[in-house]
Amino acid sequence: MLALFASIVILPFAFASCNDDETPISSPTPTTNKAECLTDSAKRAMVYSLTDLEGTKGRIYEMTYTVDYKLDEALQFGIDGTTKLRQFVALRLFDKLPTSQLPTLTYDAGCSAFACPDSRSNDYLMGRNFDFNHFALGTTNREMIPVIAVHTAPAGGLKSVSFVDGKFVDYNQGFYTDKNSDLSMLMALPYLLLDGINEKGFAVSVLKLDGLPTKQEDADKPTIFTTVAMRMLLDRASNVQEAIGMLKQYNMCMDKEKASYHFFMADATGDYAIVEYTNADTLKHPNKMEALQGNDTLRCITNFYVSPTMANTMHGINHSDHGKVRYKNLRSGLLDYNYKATPAQAKGLLQIVAQGPNDSQSSTGFTQWSEVYNLSKRTVSMSILREWGKTFEFGITQKE
């Protein structure tokens, strides 16, 4: 029998707060850290506006991205991986080039996700664990991340909130007030998202796959990277079907040497889909986009291919063990609930498949955050580091 947990409170549309006894933090956190590459006053005001949602712990921050992150230019820049993304940030979003080398920009994502209706209302939910281990170079010493919630409101586009692992631009917990970390790379945040939701109730997340990275090479299509695609979808897609149509217009490239990714998306109409890029010949790069949907077995996802094209490969559903136990537990739990769940039950499912410090030492073996998205109300309830009794509530826009 699945364990149930305290009900997640869905708070009003436009704020973030903590649900324990602490006073919610809403004012910017003071910092003396530099931002060497930024001279524009609006950009500097923005990067100095982060709020530490726990006061001084440095574990979870929130900000509103108020300047233009030039999505149209990003879509035409040929961003095929993290190196090209870093170049775009330096050339298009910085005001001047750094005098020292930029921090390494990396990207990865383990994770579990699912979608289902709320059994007690007409709302639709999406659950998501972001699982990833960061280790100090050459060691098995785990480095702890700062989570950053990023609110965006692009001109002519859709407002959204998305979530970033700050360690992917070399920010550690407490970076914002460590008197050392340069804050310039906060300009990259719109393109570092791992999941998010927009004002139409469309949500998207990314999850890791084993095997060669996706590489599409249609000469008539522009090339985009995983996170650039997700930014585009949150800014411009009102629902799952629009998102699928947008992805078909681009070459997808994912630059991890031995990994690829698939997308899990859902919307406020109850629609959901898994988008994968496939190739039954695993010695070649995946290059065929598939949108998988239409039955309850596709309501959940972990870290192997679910496409029939890949089923009998080493990375497909019939042979891969990467995330298989988590997948079976999600499938079993959703079936027990007849593919419907309350927010508390959805949180319970995330707890069952969460990974702790004594689990796998693989890159995908540690749960950094867990979220229940209410797609109908456009809210997100997040717990970090398996601290299930404490949640942070987010709306599309940040509380003033």
Regions flagged by a language model, labelled:
Residues 245-255, 263:
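Secretory/export targeting leaders with adjacent low-complexity proregions
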Residues 314-343:
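Long, charge-rich alpha-helical interaction segments
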Residues 231-234, 244-247, 331:
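Non-transmembrane alpha-helical segments in soluble domains
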Residues 257-311:
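Extended amphipathic alpha-helical segments with heptad-repeat/coiled-coil character used for oligomerization
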Residues 18-238, 252-253, 339-400:
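N-terminal mature-domain region immediately after signal-peptide cleavage
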Residues 155-167, 307-320:
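A recognition module on extended beta-rich or small alphabeta surfaces enriched in W/G with H and D/E
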Residues 13-17:
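C-terminal motif of bacterial Sec signal peptides marking the signal peptidase cleavage site
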